[in-house]
């Protein structure tokens, strides 16, 4: 029932946060990735990403293989997509295995009609390849007219640790708390220029 699914979703989320102690749960999470419940599949994908479960790559790629017109199509009578593409894409980025088959599955989602999906795809490609063009795509989304999209791009830049975007992050029309979270991501996840001192000074200016 609905209540059981809610419990299962919470369990999948909790498993992701218990990494690496939850490695034994990976087979169950892979099974859950095939569940009929959208929320369960989403929670399982996020947990697999948090666990950096490289054995999940094939299943995640299979879920996305039909591209924006398949996995990324909107369900009938629902705002949801056929598959939880945002979570699936982000899981591949968090697992962090840069292989041609993964890149080939992710790249078509850069053309998805929903900017949140485009942001997730750019984040994943940035995490996997480190190529500046994907960071620049995320910076462009910081100017999007919808606040929800700007928020997502902030979080995606932070998750990818792309330090060249720090000034654009600081200037984004969004809550300072989110900008601080994104900048903290640059400090924790990123390396190179600018250095930590410049990033921390930028954070201080937002406090």
What are these regions (language model features)?
Residues 16, 49, 89, 93, ...:
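Structural signature of alpha-helical solenoid repeat scaffolds
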Residues 115, 126, 147, 154-158, ...:
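Long, ordered, amphipathic alpha-helical scaffolds
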Residues 3-13, 76-92:
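Glycine-rich, flexible loop segments associated with nucleotide phosphate handling
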Residues 67, 76-83, 87, 185-191, ...:
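Extended, low-complexity, acidic/polar intrinsically disordered regions
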Residues 8, 41, 81, 85, ...:
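Residue-level detector of extended alpha-helical repeat arrays and alpha-solenoid scaffolds
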Residues 3-4, 36-37, 67-69, 81, ...:
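Short inter-helical turns and helix N-cap capping residues of alpha-solenoid HEAT/ARM repeat scaffolds
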Residues 1, 20-34, 53-75, 98-110, ...:
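Amphipathic alpha-helical scaffolding segments comprising HEAT/armadillo-like alpha-solenoid repeats
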Residues 11, 44, 88, 121, ...:
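Conserved hydrophobic register position within alpha-solenoid helical repeats
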